[in-house]
Regions:
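Short alpha-helical hairpin
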Residues: 1-9
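Short helix-capping segments at alpha-helix termini
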Residues: 79-85
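His-Asp-centered metal-binding catalytic motifs of divalent-metal-dependent phosphohydrolases/nucleases
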Residues: 42-62, 67-71, 75, 89-99, ...
């Protein structure tokens, strides 16, 4: 709740797809991941910062492998993080928008001293973000990294339905049918 209440709305990307709703749901999934994975308070806070600001580098909706890199450049200014935490945060945020096979090279680029911690935060961010793909009718559990995330798939659907209902938005936004018509997701994230 604290992460949502203290969210810096001014830096979020404004969008029906990657805007506030997506960020709030990603924060919820991140918080649940932190509980499921028994993260420390420090790692929970770091993961929630990553969930909150992972899309601040977006300039458009759609497939964009570079927005994480742009977000990584600014995330220290937004969160006030420094040192090792900032390195891990930058690495996780950049890795979230890249293909799975590129994760390790992205993490290596930032040289965190605790690579296992960096990889853990990056994987949990990718799963929290991925669980909200229900909003675009494109959640595939084969792309989730953690068993706890796979088990949360039904919750992701319910969270999305309740969120949309509470805020008075359609369950299938107008952009989804057109997007589904044109998508070609085979091998995109491999």
């Amino acid at each position: 709740v604290h992460a949502v209440e203290h969210l810096n709305l001014d830096v979020l990307y404004e969008s029906k797809i990657h805007g506030l709703g997506h960020i709030e749901r990603t924060l919820c999934h991140g918080g649940m991941s932190a509980m499921d994975e028994h993260l420390s308070e420090a790692d929970t806070s770091l993961l929630l910062d990553a969930c909150a600001y992972h899309d601040i580098g977006r300039s458009r909706d759609g497939l964009d492998f570079e927005h994480g890199s742009v977000a990584a450049r600014f995330i220290g200014l937004v969160t006030g993080r420094t040192g090792e935490d900032l390195l891990i945060l930058k690495a996780a945020v950049e890795a979230h928008s890249r293909k799975e096979k590129e994760m390790q090279s992205v993490l290596d680029k930032y040289h965190p001293s605790d690579m296992a911690r960096a990889k853990n935060i990056a994987q949990l961010l990718k799963d929290a973000d991925g669980l909200d793909r229900v909003r675009i009718c494109d959640l595939d559990e084969n792309f989730l990294r953690r068993e706890s995330s796979v088990h949360r798939e039904p919750f992701a659907h319910q969270l999305y339905i309740r969120y949309q209902t509470v805020v008075g938005l359609p369950l299938v936004p107008d952009f989804v049918p057109e997007m589904l018509k044109h998508r070609n997701r085979e091998k995109v994230w491999l």
